[in-house]
Amino acid sequence: MGQTVTTPLSLTLEHWGDVQRIASNQSVDVKKRRWVTFCSAEWPTFDVGWPQDGTFNLDIILQVKSKVFSPGPHGHPDQVPYIVTWEAIAYEPPPWVKPFVSPKLSPSPTAPILPSGPSTQPPPRSALYPALTPSIKPRPSKPQVLSDDGGPLIDLLTEDPPPYGEQGPSSSDGDGDREEATSTSEIPAPSPMVSRLRGKRDPPAADSTTSRAFPLRLGGNGQKNNNPSFSEDPGKLTALIESVLTTHQPTWDDCQQLLGTLLTGEEKQRVLLEARKAVRGNDGRPTQMPNEVNAAFPLERPDWDYTTPE
């Protein structure tokens, strides 16, 4: 007797620090009083099966989310941070939530694979000389986003990439075949400084699809005073940001620095929420699936390689 029943709502209140951390990862901010009000009094009136004590059922959460994100007067923009955080908790539950989440259904058993007959291919022949495998060069690390408090923002549109040195003519003598047969392990590995200089000096090949990224140089917090406010004139600032994205192909870190420099915290949060709402699924229409939204518009730094064309 005297034992209290643990509910999803009470569980989130007991781990409120983790809830705020998850909300911060979604670039939103939540308050405890409004968290309780929306869960116990507002969302049960949507008639989608939301209980007053809350739930971690992802299907019900997505139905509430569709009501919150409804366009026009039927939407609830003030509830967006809270339902997005509920969705993140249910989609990737922390340890204290996993006991309350329904286990995923195991895949149906498949028919056993029959062993194939004896192979009719001839046995492989051993080579007289060992095969030479080319050495795999390490993937270049992501450049650090640097800032120059003294430079104006117009440098982003007029700055040219650093010049490249001319590439020396290739040797055309008859020793090419013997050089290719030489083991690559005999060539000493260049030092990190030499590799960095060489990567900036050697131009890419004619048929190469590798992209090269250069860090943006922003002018610090003074750029908010030198450019129009996004709330007052969103069209002019949007055109400026689009021109930077087109001419410089910035990385994920560059985009975060660009938004943080030109927008206020509230404006940046509104832009991120609208961008995630505009993500389209395979059918070409806006999607609400968390995995598709996070894959197309990640809020945390993704493991992307900026040297590839995609």
Swiss-Prot record:
An annotated Gene Ontology molecular function: RNA binding
Record-level GO BP terms: viral budding via host ESCRT complex
Motif stretch (PPXY motif): 161-164
Record carries keyword Lipoprotein: yes
Pfam families: Gag_MA (PF01140), Gag_p12 (PF01141), Gag_p30 (PF02093)
Gene Ontology, cellular component aspect: host cell plasma membrane; membrane; viral capsid
InterPro entries according to UniProt: G_retro_matrix, G_retro_matrix_sf, Gag_p12, Gag_P30, Retrov_capsid_N, Retroviral_Gag-Pol_poly, Retrovr_matrix
Site positions for Cleavage: Y129, P130, F214, P215
Region (Disordered): 107-234, 281-310
Name of the protein in its database record: Gag polyprotein
Organism: FBR murine osteosarcoma virus (FBR-MSV)
